[in-house]
């Protein structure tokens, strides 16, 4: 009863002294108002703290492999990240050929970028717009929204930055061949895959209408794929399976009219794969009835025919119903304009250093298909390397000095390590022994600059451009995000190799691409796999490896479940041919 008696006495006090209740109410309201005011209007001292600790603004252009990987990995609260892209999702592009034929649904391979960018300790925001100009002088990017805006809104706007990360990817390369842009389908985006799927169904529906002769039906059902790379080969395989496993059951009269042709300008398809895979793929396509025309270069395309020229100079005309163009990548207009501004107008892609920093722009980075690493060559810096290593200025290097400098060289120039592996050498000592043996010199305890040149003269042969794949872009995004996370620490304590043409060390270790292997689905539940160590596998077992790897590489559990369920649905019910 004590609590009740207490409240009874308190109530009696308010009743006997009304002014007491008024004072309490006024105090409560005033106190709450002060709290609200203090939150809405922080003190001048707080403003001073915020100014001192202003977050550095990172603008990221693009939501592809490089951009999504950068967002997922970045974990430093000192940055404010602004993502700008015309698409508000990340697409798992290796499965786009599967989307074209309904093996996998389009929504199963996309993840909203806001889900990826949503982090508790990193401030991130997204703008659905396309960047059309980069101004490195004023540190601004100019963007254009594709959304409708109200009377107060602006369709074009600019965004300033402290750091700019360019990950816009690339566009399909038409090589300025007449008619390609107007008459061909590309396979770079999810929308491209959806259009191809709709066109395939349209072709079968049109060919089923009465009043057409057989020649016109054959033309409508003739599907041409230009490009014998991984994308073109996989699409041709998917289309073949879609036609023979599903569509011929629904369109039985079209069974003997369908034809798939693959045009490749080189002497073989899948030239980036092992020779065993190339030969197997060509033999399988022949068995499947896919007409592979090697050494055929497209010269012209109109609305019903495609013209191709052989290496002998003979030009043939092929009637078609649909063309899928998959011959390589080209530079986007915004990147071309930016390259002209910074003196790279004659290049095909943005040139960066080994730290993915655009050459000539300290605060701008580029990764993925829009850029290429301009790897410095050892022989270009050989004099500076020797001078840096010769600490006693004696004109020769001792074995100790040689090994010390080679350790830094291996960090700075990845081609050295690649050369050692290609020659089966176990270390730097083997490289030196080989050079001495070739020159007929004795095994001396010191070497001069000419002997150093002789030892390293062949290593630059391993300098190669990285392939334009999602695997490379993803690794670059992860690498750059980790560099940003450790930027403050590495400013004080550099972790990179020694500066050959300067003092001190680089802040970070340079980017190193680690090739994890590649797949080439060939249809009929058969896949070719090429993994590091010259390991090649072809057949049904590799197909199951492909399933497991691609499922594990999804960016979220949502897409992982959707993709696997689509595969199961296809196994049970087949592919959907509805046009919706």
From Swiss-Prot:
Cofactor binding note: Binds 1 FAD per subunit.
Residues that, per the record, bind FAD: 57-87
Xref: SUPFAM superfamilies: EF-hand, FAD/NAD(P)-binding domain
Main localization (coarse): mitochondrion
Extent of the transit peptide: 1-38
Residues in EF-hand domain copies: 377-412
Subcellular localization, as worded in the UniProt entry: Mitochondrion inner membrane; Peroxisome
A Pfam family the protein falls into: Pyr_redox_2
UniProt-recorded name of the protein: External alternative NAD(P)H-ubiquinone oxidoreductase B3, mitochondrial
Biological source species: Arabidopsis thaliana
Lineage: Eukaryota, Viridiplantae, Streptophyta, Embryophyta, Tracheophyta
